Amino acid sequence: MKKILFVASECVPFIKTGGLADVCGALPKEFDKNYWDVRVVIPDYSCIPEQYRNNFEYVTHFYMSSGPYVQDKYVGVLKYEQDGVTYYFIDNQEFFTGFSPYTSDTKFEIEKYTFFDKAVLSMLPLIDFKPDIIHCHDWQTGFLPVYLKNEFAANPFFWGIKTIITIHNLKFQGIWDREWVQGVSGLTDNLFTPDKLEFKKDANMLKGGLVYADYITTVSDNEIQTEYYGEGLNGLLSARHFDMQGIVNGIDYNAYDPQTDGRIYCNYNASDFRKKKFNNKTKLQQDLGLAVDK
């Protein structure tokens, strides 16, 4: 049986701010569990609804330093199972407490997710789970492939693990002062070069993931390889185009079924959608105080 670990900063039904959460919530459920052992790990945000948090199971804990500036931090590991998928949650109240999963403090966010990336790898031997593939998502998981190919490379447990990183939003890359990022990550000097983590003399988490991941997927076919849409990384992405695939997002047909979706005014199906979609449009126009028309 092959093993896959999804690593992300958000995942439905636990926490969602955008489409990333939909993908990480829907895709793991679709694997045939007879052939795939699929698990997911996200931070244990205090804003995850109590209906889930009250059912989390304690797995283990340990203490970890991610760099000279981040020493001896508590890492708790919690677990929850749903729809045949095991979800893990990395617990640290210093980083993951608040009314929202994210803050506007970029410096803190980079420190937080650098810690998260290293904690995810560090927990794997303790829970006795060695994935064949680790599927990373967006800049928040960018340092995981970097750690795997460098700091963790000497440990036989991690040999043979492959990584994929998916870009959901290239505009956000996790960029900050190189010296400070090195201080919170513990990554060595030789990694902060223009062909690796350096970006315009700063450090770039997403770039690190794109350099060190074994494969890259995007939610568009080829736009990000162009200068206009490449957000400064189009050269790197073009250089790796043989290891990259564009996969346009689909939808969860159970969550977005117009026959059963309770979030629309009037449910419909293939035989009556013309009439009933008009009813939905009319109700929306009325609710927003717009002129009602066809």
Describe each model-derived feature in a short phrase.
Residues 1-294:
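Catalytic cores of nucleotide-sugar-dependent glycosyltransferases that transfer UDP/GDP/TDP-activated
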